[in-house]
Amino acid sequence: MSQILKDDLIAKIKDGIIVSCQALPQEPLYTEAGGVIPLLVKAAEQGGAVGIRANSVRDIREIKEVTSLPIIGIIKRDYPPQEPFITATMREVDELAALDIEVIALDCTKRERHDGLTVADFIKQVKVKYPHQLLMADISTYEEAAAAVEAGVDFVGTTLSGYTSYSPKVDGPDIELIRRLCQAGFDVIAEGKIHYPSQAKQIHDLGVRGIVVGGAITRPKEITERFVAGLK
């Protein structure tokens, strides 16, 4: 696994944009053969990205062939009827840890988990098994972030704000949550519904450690829909 120090990673990402490059099977850019996501990564790097967030073993392996940028890795795998699907069990952590990536992101919401563990117990098990691996908690509320930090994660990401039944539904990033997390002294990687450069600048000025932008850069269907809706 990657042995990068937390402070070294922060120095690499704190003043730039991490680009999320993903395509799920139901999305236009997904192909069974692969090969598309690395092209998005190359474009993002040429545009000045300081890091990449990516999903799946296949995509991450292909990405590592074309860039040396830091990678936040996840594996999206459904475990119905439970809702968490972002690196939801140790199985996914094991697969990601074998890829030698800088950060592994985990679902750290309070929702019922497939493995039956509490979030705190899951984090602690991961820390025991992979003590040098940097971890990012994908959360939707302040309380979830605080619990994850107490359990030992390195970063908290606002990835899931608006995507749990109990978090605020807003058409844009959860600025108030980001502000509160920064004021509490947490190492925040802001993510979720960041559609415009002005929003990224506002978030940067709050003191976050990193900013992840996905759909606004790498999902042309979503970008097109936003322009089409703007004409109505």
UniProtKB/Swiss-Prot annotation:
Keyword Calcium: no
Enzyme Commission (EC) number: 5.1.3.9
Superkingdom of the source species: Bacteria
Catalysed reactions listed for this entry: an N-acyl-D-glucosamine 6-phosphate = an N-acyl-D-mannosamine 6-phosphate
Gene3D superfamilies assigned: Aldolase class I (3.20.20.70)
Gene Ontology CC annotation, any one: cytosol
Ranges that cross the membrane: none
One MF annotation (Gene Ontology) recorded for this entry: N-acylglucosamine-6-phosphate 2-epimerase activity
KW Lipid metabolism (keyword) present: no
Annotated pathway: Amino-sugar metabolism; N-acetylneuraminate degradation; D-fructose 6-phosphate from N-acetylneuraminate: step 3/5
InterPro entries assigned to the protein according to its UniProt record, in alphabetical order: Aldolase_TIM (IPR013785), NanE (IPR007260), RibuloseP-bd_barrel (IPR011060)
GO-annotated biological processes: carbohydrate metabolic process; N-acetylmannosamine catabolic process; N-acetylneuraminate catabolic process
Keyword vocabulary terms for this entry: Carbohydrate metabolism, Isomerase
Family named by the database record: Belongs to the NanE family.
NCBIfam families per the UniProt record, alphabetical: PRK01130.1
Job of this protein: Converts N-acetylmannosamine-6-phosphate (ManNAc-6-P) to N-acetylglucosamine-6-phosphate (GlcNAc-6-P).
Name assigned to this protein: Putative N-acetylmannosamine-6-phosphate 2-epimerase
Gene: nanE
